[in-house]
């Protein structure tokens, strides 16, 4: 006997309510920009560290090596800033981490999106002679 066909996947959830995010009213926050060689992640938090909005180069729609470009970082920062402004964020302190190419571009696009940037600090972790670094590329 062939297996019974199941209905559309949405029918099981018809009666359930979807959980909407409540709008937080946070006028001052912190923007954490993690820029690696492969991607850029922008996270905007409240002063306690709870995430309000985030975006990354991959989340915006870039794939592969295009995620590491400054333009991808710019779009990710604009996207995160727009989401944060919906929650009432107007001023941010920026914390930049990592060696990637999207660091300065992301800060500039946060300002261009309408957020007032306060302090900018580099929180890239520096090893006190930790693990052995990867080999230099021979091209």
Swiss-Prot record:
> According to the UniProt record, where is the region Disordered?
1-33
Annotated GO biological process: translation
Transmembrane feature ranges: none
Basic residues bias spans: 14-23
Has the keyword Cell cycle been applied to this entry? no
Report a single Gene Ontology molecular function.
Answer: structural constituent of ribosome
Query: Which keywords describe this protein according to UniProt?
Result: Ribonucleoprotein, Ribosomal protein, RNA-binding, rRNA-binding
* SUPFAM superfamilies recorded: Translational machinery components
| Pfam families cross-referenced by the UniProt entry | Ribosomal_S11 (PF00411)
Checking InterPro entries in the record gives:
Ribosomal_uS11, Ribosomal_uS11_bac-type, Ribosomal_uS11_CS, Ribosomal_uS11_sf
Q: Which GO terms describe its cellular component?
A: ribonucleoprotein complex; ribosome
Q: What does this protein do?
A: Located on the platform of the 30S subunit, it bridges several disparate RNA helices of the 16S rRNA. Forms part of the Shine-Dalgarno cleft in the 70S ribosome.
The subunit field of the Swiss-Prot or TrEMBL record says:
Part of the 30S ribosomal subunit. Interacts with proteins S7 and S18. Binds to IF-3.
Family that this chain belongs to: Belongs to the universal ribosomal protein uS11 family.
This protein is called what? Small ribosomal subunit protein uS11
Species source reads Mycobacterium bovis (strain ATCC BAA-935 / AF2122/97)
Gene encoding the protein: rpsK
